[in-house]
Regions:
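Pyridoxal 5′-phosphate
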Residues: 1-388
């Protein structure tokens, strides 16, 4: 059995021991329902209020502007569905990009198909970025919401969110950014650097627990709720709050965002070593941009190879990587990001390596030692399957 090399930090990260320790009292002793009026409930409510105040202080917002969610997917759903529905009397035109996470794209698909909204999906350049000029040309009198992710989960492109947000604000249009992949990977001062009205955050992307996220909602915006059953989270998100996970989220924010845990010389050097070596490999084409990109992410395609064969080959050698695409019933869907880059023939062959704080130079060299053979096997298996 080969040793395990984890190069999939954009998918999830291990829970940090200090974060786990901060969560433990909420699992063992302070386990009351924050909505209960008795002493155990009041203890839990005090912890919830303190966690919200800590998050707001760290992010640079008001506590009332922080809504705790079950993760990035719910935060995106609340931001997009809730805001579009709340503002539909003003207009039903929405703008997003062609390279959003499925948690965003599928919200826009639903609003378009089921609720009569018009959706403009902005193209991207060869580096996967949206042009501010394209956004400005897409504005209409009935545009009420723009949503563009801060950083792409598949290829690591960093969007010009501050400029996009400024363009929206100049027109009085609400701007949401999915910052799930951004936090922990790029320098952070406060939320104002996004020029956004709504910002999605997810704990397990920076050594926090799964099942915890938040949505910043700039006052006085009030999206319609998408969950019903109580007045929790200022009547914006029904359901008993997951207090241990919330405390873990806030602790991870405080420990790993400033300075960002992934934004280190070591990680950038390891990323650059991978980039230089993969660029020289036969059959590989890099698709992750080298400028304005996440410091830990390397993405490439192998035209003519099957993505599942590539991932299976890596896994057999103990290497945990990702296609960046949804996997269903043993087959990979084409990467929408690679399709948006105009590389249709290679959209099924994306491989993403995403590094983290425990990645080492030895890991990188071990991967590079076996990668050419894995690529060769994947190409040969594709040719064999096609009868060539």
């Amino acid at each position: 059995m080969p040793r395990t090399i984890y190069f999939d930090y954009n998918a999830t990260t291990p829970l940090d021991p200090a974060v786990q320790a901060a969560m433990q009292p909420l699992l063992a002793t302070i386990w009351g329902n924050p909505s209960s009026v008795h002493r155990l409930g009041r203890q839990a409510r005090a912890q919830l209020d303190a966690a919200r105040a800590r998050a707001a202080s760290f992010l640079g917002s008001k506590p009332s502007e922080i809504i705790f969610t079950s993760g990035g997917t719910e935060a995106n759903n609340l931001a997009i569905l809730g805001t579009a529905r709340a503002l539909q009397a003003k207009g039903k035109h929405l703008i997003t990009s062609a390279v959003e996470h499925h948690a965003g794209l599928q919200c826009f698909d639903y609003l378009e198909k089921k609720e009569g909204f018009a959706v403009t999906r902005l193209p991207v350049d060869g580096a996967g970025r949206v042009a501010v000029a394209d956004l400005q040309r897409a504005f209409r009198p009935d545009t009420v919401l723009v949503s563009v992710m801060a950083a792409n989960n598949e290829i690591g492109s960093v969007q010009p969110v501050a400029a996009l947000g400024a363009a929206c604000r100049a027109r009085g249009i609400i701007f949401h950014t999915d910052a799930v992949q951004w936090f922990g990977k790029l320098p952070f001062t406060n939320l104002s650097q996004f020029n956004a009205d709504l910002v999605s955050v997810c704990a397990h992307k920076f050594h926090g627990p799964k099942g915890a996220g938040l949505l910043y909602i700039r006052s006085p915006l009030h999206p319609d709720p998408i969950l019903f059953g109580g007045g929790h989270e200022n009547e914006r998100r029904a359901g008993t709050e997951n207090l241990p996970a919330i405390v873990g989220l806030v602790t991870a924010l405080e420990n790993f965002i400033a300075p960002p845990v992934f934004f280190t010389d070591k990680i950038r050097e390891l990323r650059d070593r991978l980039v230089m070596a993969i660029a020289k490999m036969d059959g590989c084409e890099l698709v992750s941009p080298q400028a304005e990109s996440l410091p830990n992410t390397v993405a490439f395609v192998v035209p003519g190879a099957d993505g599942m064969a590539l991932l299976a080959g890596l896994d057999m050698d103990g290497i945990c990587a990702s296609s960046g695409a949804a996997c269903s019933a043993g087959s990979l869907e084409p990467s929408l990001v690679v399709l948006a880059l105009g590389k249709k023939a290679a959209a099924n062959s994306l491989v993403r390596f995403s590094l983290g704080r425990d990645s080492t130079a030895e890991d990188v060299e071990a991967v590079l030692a076996v990668l050419p053979e894995i690529i060769g096997r994947a190409l040969r298996s594709k040719l064999s399957a096609s009868g060539v």
